[in-house]
Amino acid sequence: MKKLLLVNGPNLNRLGVREVNVYGKGTLATLEVDMKQEAETMGVELECFQSNHEGAIIDIIHEAEDIYKGIILNPGAFTHYSYAIRDAIASISIPVIEVHISNIHQRESFRHESVTAAVCAGQIVGFGFYGYKLALFALMEKLREA
């Protein structure tokens, strides 16, 4: 069975509590359960990881190449300034789909730019938790094309 990785970055452990007007009331635990179930219906295994620490995210991206077929990544605020995470993504050969719960292009100006998107296979923004499912569908299609 193919294995995929879902990586959530800083503050996403606070989903359901933090800025519910932006991110909704759903929790990270609920999101992870829903995503694992959706992946299972597609015949793949999804493992989930969340960290508030840039180095931990870089480490798991590096390790992912030998374990997983692809990554769904919400880098959180690291999206806008982490060239280290960008370089980690660029250093691996498996596809990465960037996802954001909110539409980063409609928010504060500092959130409009993603330094990580250019090295990802694609970016999905603004569809709430459903965006993660869209990312899963897109990643599966990318893997079929390979």
Curated annotation (Swiss-Prot):
Q: Where along the chain is substrate bound?
A: 74, 80, 87, 101-102, 111
The record's listing under SUPFAM superfamilies reads: Type II 3-dehydroquinate dehydratase
Keywords in alphabetical order: Amino-acid biosynthesis, Aromatic amino acid biosynthesis, Lyase
**CDD domains, alphabetically?**
DHQase_II (cd00466)
One function term, GO molecular function aspect: 3-dehydroquinate dehydratase activity
Known function: Catalyzes a trans-dehydration via an enolate intermediate.
This chain's protein is named 3-dehydroquinate dehydratase
* Organism listed in the record: Bacillus cereus (strain B4264)
